[in-house]
Structure formats: structure tokens, C-alpha cells
Amino acid sequence: MKKIVLLIVILIFLTGCSSLAIFNLSDFTIPDDELFIMTIDNLKTPEEICRYMADNFEYEEHPDITLSPYQLYLIKKGDCNDYMTFSIFIADYHEYETYYVLITFANERYKHSITVYKENKYSFSDYEMYFLPKYDTFLEIVEYDCFLRREKWTEYIVYDYDNGLIEKGSNN
């Protein structure tokens, strides 16, 4: 039995299955930390959220876990999935309609995640930058993000704040 479990774990790793776990924000409770609460109160727009992340966080891969918004706030190191969870939580707190997009690149073992905000049009952010609201579709955002990264995508999946599936796209 142990050999079977080990074999399954190895197969998942070798097939490039990312462990970009979807953090269930409905289970997240804002901690009783005045500085954290003040921080989220002051980050009122997606652009402010992204600027805060760029100024305060350092990119570090966490392929096996997704940090809560508070954990990222405390340790200040995370990957695109951690940044995405942080930004979605704070934007939703300020009543923005938010989505997250998981993108599978053709030549990558791991998926990439970005945050999408519904302003007049769609805007988005990754772990580095905020992109102005000028996009009409999720596909446009995926195409542009991949263009910037010089990557080809094979699949993308869009979820809403409550982890509901919104859209899937394939580029095979």
C-alpha cells in the first residue's frame, strides 16, 4: 500500500500537476491584528493592493501550499498563488467583483495564477504588476499575460471568489 501511495505521488509530480491549491477564502477569518486590519482598510483599490504587494512582498515559490492572506502579510514571501489569494481577499473586502485565473503554460510544470478585477472592464494583476481595466474577456487577459511572459498557454480556468467555476479555455 505504501508503494502505491508513493507511486501516485511520484506520478503526480512527474506529470507536472501543480499543487496550486485553491485557498477557500470563505473559511478565512480576519485575525484580531490591528495592523493587518488597518492595512486591508487602507488598500481600497486593486492598484493600491498591487502597489502594496510589490513594495512589501518578495517572490518565493511555495509549490505545495497556498498561504492565507494573513500568512503572506506576516512572512512577506510568496508565489503568484499567494499574491492572488491576498489580492482577491482585499479587493472583495472592498466590494470589488474578483476572479482568479489559473493558467497552464505549454513548457512549464507549474501553473500560474493571476487576479482579475471587474471595474468598468476587466483589469488584472500578477505578483509584479497591475494592468489597467481595458480587457473585455478573460481570454484577452490570458493572451496578454502569456505574451508578456513569452509563454504559450495550453489551458486556463477562471473561478469566482467563492471558487465557483466560471470559464475554461483550451489552446491545444
Show where each model-derived region lies.
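Sec-dependent N-terminal signal peptides
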Residues: 4-14
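A structural boundary/capping signal
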Residues: 18-172
